[in-house]
C-alpha cells in the first residue's frame, strides 16, 4: 500500500549489504558486490569475500544501533557532530526548515493513520505488548505497559486500533504528534536518479549514517511517510522534494535526529 514500487524494500536490502560489508571486517575480510547480476527480478547481489580488509570502526555499533522512535531532547546537535554526519547525509538544523519538516512529517503521518487501507497495513504489522514482541520481534512494536495490560485483558483489540473515532486511537495519535514535533534536526539522503541501483546504494549509505549516529550518542528515526508514492500523500511528497531535492534528484530517506531522552532498543530476531 505505502510502498507501491518497492523502493523502500530495495533500500532495506542496501542496508543489509552494507551491514554485511562492515561486519566482515571484524574477521579481516573485504566484500565486493555484484549488484542485481540478473536484473531486478533475480538475486539482489552476489557477494565475493577476500582477505586483507582493514577493521571498520563502525562495526562495534552494529548490535547497539536502533531506530529511536521516542521524543528527542531540545538540545541542539553540536556542529562537530553535524559535520561528522554530513559525510553521509545532509543535516537540516536551521529552525525555519526544521519547523516546516516537523509539520510536513506530522501531516503525512496523520494522513497515513486516517486512510483506512494504509492504517490497516500498519495495524496488521503491529506487535502489541511483550508477548507479541517477543514472539515476532519485527514490525511496529507497541510496548507501553498500559497498552500491554489492556490488550491482555481484551480491552484493546486490533479492531479498536482501526476505529479512528475510538478514544484510544486519538490518544495514540496525540502521543505520535508530540513525538514528531520533539525533533531538533532532520537527516536527508538524496540520489541523482531513482533506479534500483540508486535505491540499494542509498540503503548502503544510510546504514553508515545510522551507525555513525550511534557512535556519536545520538538517535535517529526514519520518517519515510512523506517519501512514499501513493496518491493520498502526493502533496507532501512534492513539498519535501521542492524543499530538499535538486532537479532530477529523489529524496530516498528522511529522518528525525537528536539526543535521546529514554533510549529503548528496537526488538530484533536473534542471530
Segments and roles (model prediction):
Residues 1-271:
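Acidic, surface-exposed loops and disordered segments
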Amino acid at each position: 500500500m505505502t510502498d507501491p514500487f518497492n523502493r523502500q524494500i530495495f533500500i532495506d536490502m542496501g542496508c543489509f549489504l552494507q551491514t554485511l560489508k562492515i561486519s566482515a571486517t571484524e574477521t579481516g575480510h573485504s566484500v565486493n558486490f555484484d549488484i542485481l547480476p540478473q536484473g531486478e527480478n533475480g538475486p539482489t547481489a552476489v557477494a565475493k569475500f577476500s582477505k586483507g580488509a582493514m577493521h571498520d570502526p563502525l562495526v562495534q555499533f552494529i548490535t547497539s544501533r536502533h531506530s529511536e522512535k521516542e521524543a528527542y531532547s531540545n538540545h541542539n546537535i553540536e556542529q562537530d557532530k553535524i559535520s561528522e554526519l554530513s559525510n553521509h547525509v545532509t543535516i537540516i538544523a536551521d529552525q525555519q526548515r526544521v519547523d516546516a519538516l516537523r509539520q510536513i512529517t506530522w501531516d503525512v503521518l496523520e494522513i497515513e493513520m486516517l486512510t483506512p487501507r494504509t492504517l490497516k497495513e500498519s495495524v496488521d504489522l503491529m506487535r502489541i505488548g511483550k508477548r507479541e514482541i517477543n514472539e515476532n520481534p519485527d514490525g511496529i512494536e507497541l510496548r507501553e505497559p498500559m497498552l500491554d495490560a489492556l490488550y491482555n485483558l481484551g480491552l484493546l483489540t486490533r479492531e479498536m486500533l482501526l476505529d479512528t473515532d475510538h478514544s484510544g486511537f486519538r490518544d495514540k495519535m496525540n502521543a505520535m504528534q508530540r513525538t514528531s514535533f520533539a525533533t531538533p534536526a532532520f537527516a536527508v539522503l538524496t540520489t541523482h536518479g531513482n533506479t534500483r541501483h540508486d535505491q540499494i546504494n542509498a540503503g548502503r549509505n544510510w546504514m553508515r549514517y545510522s551507525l555513525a549516529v550511534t557512535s556519536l550518542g545520538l538517535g535517529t528515526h526514519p520518517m519515510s511517510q512523506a517519501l512514499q508514492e501513493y496518491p493520498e500523500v502526493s502533496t507532501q511528497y512534492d513539498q519535501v522534494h521542492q524543499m530538499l531535492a535538486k532537479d532530477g534528484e529523489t529524496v530516498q530517506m528522511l529522518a528525525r535526529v537528536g539526543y535521546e531522552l529514554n533510549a529503548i532498543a528496537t526488538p530484533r530476531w536473534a542471530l
